């Protein structure tokens, strides 16, 4: 047990009241979720994080401990504060207080102060000059990409204290250099490790594979695998999942599938993020059969699909005119652990609207009503486009009236639908007069409709004309000063149509 110094005791005696708790949480927590996203390389390493509090000594008084820790944090937060001066004033810090200071400096991006504080603190007690403490300091510096400081600490432990760097220290340095694309430096320390009698492990090569994937050096991944085998490192499930993800991101589908088959034949664990990577790769190349097979596995396993990936799948179906699949996709993401989102309803409405199926559209609308799903701009415009395809002007008028009563916000797409219909056989005079009366046409132009609607239906004549007149007005005094309202935009479109021969 460490005793409190006189300076610490006198400093606590000056506190008039209990200070607020420190602005950080000393306990680590892991959040569990059923939603998966494709991880970046840094998340794939399997080494357990070093605990900042792992070797903290028990303070004389828990109350005094928290008071001093809080006071120390406040003093560090002051403008112009110097941790070395504070250490001198306090005489010494316990391990718990020291690592709290290091974490504060790290979170405050004061990385250049970490090593001087560590050097001063460790020299106060010879037992602090240890491989474990150096490992933690070097790990922090490598994670923050402060490699010059990390290497200085690395050289100090070898040259000044004749300590042998651990495998974890070498891995931190190798992975950090590789992640920055500095592979020459990474290989230097890999060889340095071997020269010092430490053999790389699977995790060492996993980090290199991650980095090569990040920098799209896929041929180097293959060479890395050969070096891995020559060093006697066996690929485990982490390595195989990693390889599948990296090859899928690079669009190397053949290699991706080879790694997948190897993993499955060895009955290793297939990670959810790996399946998601494969699905995205198949969608990217428009391989519908394989895309659907993988998507069905994901939904069956209850893995949530990211909205961006769902949109990518939907666009593949739309580009291939496979509109009926949109309903299946919408139902699929609703049935999985993903809750019924607006996107799911959008897909289902789009399916039947694009197929011009009144029965299907009415059925989905009924389901929405039963589920008490509120209407929005996208839903409204999908229904309006469907009715316009059917030539059902009565339903259009009724829906517009209902939308007004329900206070559903309309946008430029809605205006465009009515405008284009007015050019045909629909009498939109009453609609425009109502919009003018309630002030809608004098509002700034907005585009709230989901882009999938444009992908499925294309842009109408009015929207294309709007883009033309807007492009013509860009850079002009009138275009910069005039407020772009629906009324103003319609006037410009009409004027432009009259001037076009």
Swiss-Prot record:
Organism: Arabidopsis thaliana (Mouse-ear cress)
InterPro entries per the UniProt record, alphabetical: Pentatricopeptide_rpt, TPR-like_helical_dom_sf
A Pfam family matched in the record: PPR
Transit peptide, from-to: 1-88
GO cellular component: chloroplast
Ranges occupied by PPR repeats: 130-160, 166-200, 201-235, 236-270, 271-305
Keyword match Repeat: yes
Domain of life: Eukaryota
Protein name according to UniProt: Pentatricopeptide repeat-containing protein At4g14190, chloroplastic
Subcellular location: Plastid, Chloroplast
Keywords: Chloroplast, Plastid, Repeat, Transit peptide
Family: Belongs to the PPR family. P subfamily.
